[in-house]
A protein has these predicted regions:
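Surface-exposed, glycine/proline- and aromatic-rich loop segments on solvent-exposed faces
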Residues: 42
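Generic start-of-chain signal for non-secretory N-termini
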Residues: 1-22
Length: 338
């Protein structure tokens, strides 16, 4: 058994019916030109009947909500679904289906993940049929970057190569110590001593936190203004999608010497500013975003290795370049603490 890390437990304890703590990924694929009508059906059967047992973290089940243990009664039928949308299905129908599924809590009495293989999609304005993979996994098991890496590893590197194993049967590296169980040769007393020795570092971090409050780029939750977006969250989810060329984001990032994530935040900031202006409800103070920040330094594809930073979205600035630069200064300042 593995002891749940503090981060794992946090995601479990914060979860409510109206605030699910799972993450998801939607992947859209084009059928090969020579694919017959049963192409997706055969793919589904191949994934469902894989003889390779599920690997970590897909074989982990909660024990008393304190430990992870291997599920000895794993049943793929509880996790994998093959769905054919009613014809003629458009992208809006796919997004509606995923929105409904993403609103539902995962079952804590089995490994907390699902995979949906969805066929019968006609992409808007594009020729040919599409099919999709929708993955849903609890954040206590894995973070977004690790989840994306697992899915990428399960995909064929070329269009001509067949998929060999579903994502849940891939062998993953052992969890890093930050996410793992206490080593067997380590007693709770030794762990307590280690934590006690860490107290001076904690004190230094708290002192640095106080000093940094005088930095002009320092962001706190108390700086966030009230807005029409401050509403109680319901259990319903609504998914929308838009496609961009990644190269466009990279060109902007390179031109202004900022990160790709800064550009994404700037796009979100611009959209929020435009929406709030249209509603005549733009706050004078900038919105503050709660942004996940990866601490992953290796190529591992499991566990939670992340924290969160606060980012000034600079929605009070009309000039998009000034807005991007303000966002970059804010995120850079927040990241310095790690």
């Amino acid at each position: 058994m593995r002891v749940l890390s503090a981060v794992d437990q946090l995601f479990l304890r914060l979860e409510t019916r109206n605030q699910p703590m799972h993450i998801g990924g939607l992947f859209l694929f084009r059928l090969p030109d020579d694919a017959d009508a049963d192409f997706v059906g055969r793919l589904a059967e191949q994934m469902r009947t894989s003889q390779i047992p599920p690997s970590f973290p897909f074989n982990q089940i909660l024990h008393r909500e304190l430990f992870w243990q291997t599920d000895g009664r794993f049943d793929v039928e509880q996790h994998f679904r093959h769905i054919a949308l009613p014809k003629p299905a458009q992208m809006a129908d796919l997004l509606t289906y995923v929105s409904q599924e993403h609103s539902k809590l995962l079952n804590r009495h089995s490994p907390m993940w699902e995979c949906h293989l969805i066929e019968g999609i006609t992409a808007d304005g594009q020729a040919g049929q599409r099919f999709a993979l929708y993955f849903k996994i609890h954040h206590a098991l894995i973070d977004g970057i690790a989840g994306l890496r697992l899915v990428q590893k399960s995909l064929s590197p070329t269009a001509d190569e067949r998929v060999s194993l579903p994502a849940w049967s891939l062998m993953t590296r052992k969890r890093h110590l930050i996410d793992s169980v206490l080593p067997t040769d380590q007693s709770l007393l030794r762990v307590a001593k280690q934590q006690t020795r860490a107290l001076p570092a904690v004190g230094q971090a708290l002192l640095r936190n106080v000093v940094e409050r005088f930095d002009g780029d320092y962001v706190t939750t108390t700086q966030a203004p009230d807005s029409i977006l401050n509403q109680k969250v319901s259990s319903a989810r609504r998914l929308s999608a838009v496609s961009f060329e990644l190269s466009r984001f990279r060109r902007v990032a390179d031109a202004f010497g900022v990160s790709l994530n800064d550009v994404v935040l700037a796009v979100c900031s611009g959209a929020l500013r435009r929406y709030l202006l249209a509603q005549q409800a733009l706050p004078r103070k900038p919105l503050i975003a709660f942004v996940p920040y990866s601490l992953r330094t290796d190529n591992s594809a499991s566990g939670n290795q992340l924290t969160f930073i606060l980012a000034n979205l600079a929605t009070h600035l009309a000039d998009p370049v000034e807005r991007l630069q303000a966002i970059h200064a804010s995120t850079r300042n927040s990241k310095r603490r790690f």
